[in-house]
Amino acid sequence: MAPAPVPALGTLGCYRFLFNPRQHLGPSFPARRYGAPRRLCFLPQNTGTPLRVLPSVFWSPPSRKKPVLSARNSRMFGHLSPVRIPHLRGKFNLRLPSLDEQVIPARLPKMEVRAEEPKEATEVKDQVETQEQEDNKRGPCSNGEAASTSRPLETQGNPTSPRYNPRPLEGNVQLKSLTENNQTDKAQVHAVSFYSKGHGVASSHSPAGGFPRGRTPPARQHG
C-alpha cells in the first residue's frame, strides 16, 4: 500500500489548534486560578416573531355543524372499551310469586245498619198511648163504645208492624171523637126538650109517681 500523504507545513499550522485547544488565541476571560479559561457562549438568534406581535391567523365564523367525535378525538375524552360481564358459573333458579298469591282480598268493614222507624208511625203510636190514658181516666165506657174502640184496633193490627198504615188510624180517631161529641149534644138537646114539655121521666132517682122531685102531677079534669 502507498503511504498516506503528509500535509504541508502551512496546513499543519491551521489544524494544530484543533488538537491543542489551549493554544487557541481567541477572546477569552482571564484565566481562573484553578482551571482553564472560560469561553464565551454565543446564544442562537431567535428566528420567531417579535414580542407583543400576534401571528397572522385567518379567522372564520363559527360553523353550525355539530362536532363529530372521531377515533382520535375519542382518545382525548377517554378510552372507550366494551364492558365485559363475567359468566355465571352456577345456575340460580329464581322463583317469583304467582299472581294468585299476591292478590289479597279486601275486607270491607261490617257496619251495623239500624232501621229507623218512620216519623209518622212514632207520632201515631204516641197518639194511641195518650188516647188510652184518657180513656182510663174517664172510667169504664159503655159496651157500644168499647166495641167501637176495640174493633178498629183489632182490624188494624199492631201499629209497629211493617204493613201498618198510620193514616187510617188518624181518621178513625177523628171519627170517634166526632161521634162522641154528636151523641152528647143530641142527648142534651133531647133532655131539655123533654123537660120543657112537662113530661115526666121514669128513673131510679124519681119518686114513686114517676115524676121528678119538687113537682106535683097535674090534676086530671073529669068530664
Curated annotation (Swiss-Prot):
Stretch list, region Disordered: 110-223
One Pfam assignment: POM121
Signal peptide start-end: none
InterPro entries: POM121-like_prot_1
Superkingdom to which the source organism belongs: Eukaryota
Basic and acidic residues bias spans: 110-138
UniProt similarity note: Belongs to the UPF0607 family.
UniProt protein name: Putative UPF0607 protein LOC392364
Organism (species): Homo sapiens (Human)
Taxonomic lineage: Eukaryota, Metazoa, Chordata, Craniata, Vertebrata
